[in-house]
Amino acid sequence: VTSLAIPPDTDPVLDEPGLVEMLCYRAKKLNRAHVYPVGALTIGLKGQQLSEMAELVEAGCVAFSQANTPILDTRVLGRAMQYAATFGFRVWLQPIDPHLARGGVAHDGEVASRLGLPGIPASSEIIALFTYLQMARLTGARLHITRLSSADSLALIDQARADGVDVTCD
């Protein structure tokens, strides 16, 4: 491994410039891999108050994310995307509706059933993804969507790209 994107859900959360600077300093000192910190989109990943993205970029962050913690308040999500768009920062989001996904641990389907795992319905991903893409259309935010698991989600991504939304995915 030569490069690592470090998500913000560390302990402590990567929501302060000093923490990011320390992470970059330690990684450089070890000289084992290139480290690319992904800063917290909101303070403490709580989804309430925006982090100081400009300061976090100065400290070394390459993008912003909520890690596995969705922002439930779409007003906060919109403000975060608008702020990120103003500076050209990329926002990484995992599309999952926490209410529809409650109790699930894997994409709902044949494999989950065979393994006896409680499933997360595709609708959980699609509904959250639709919201994220609409907010990106409205704000001009650059998105990276993580951990997609359904063909319908890929179709939404393709349509958004055709409409001019700057979105990548994995």
Tell me what each language-model feature is.
Residues 1-30:
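Metal-associated gating/positioning segment near the N- to mid-region
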Residues 10-11, 42, 68, 96:
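Short, glycine/serine-rich, charged loops/turns that create anion-binding
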Residues 2-8, 37-39, 65, 146:
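Active-site neighborhood of phospho(di)ester-bond hydrolases with catalytic His/Asp-centered motifs
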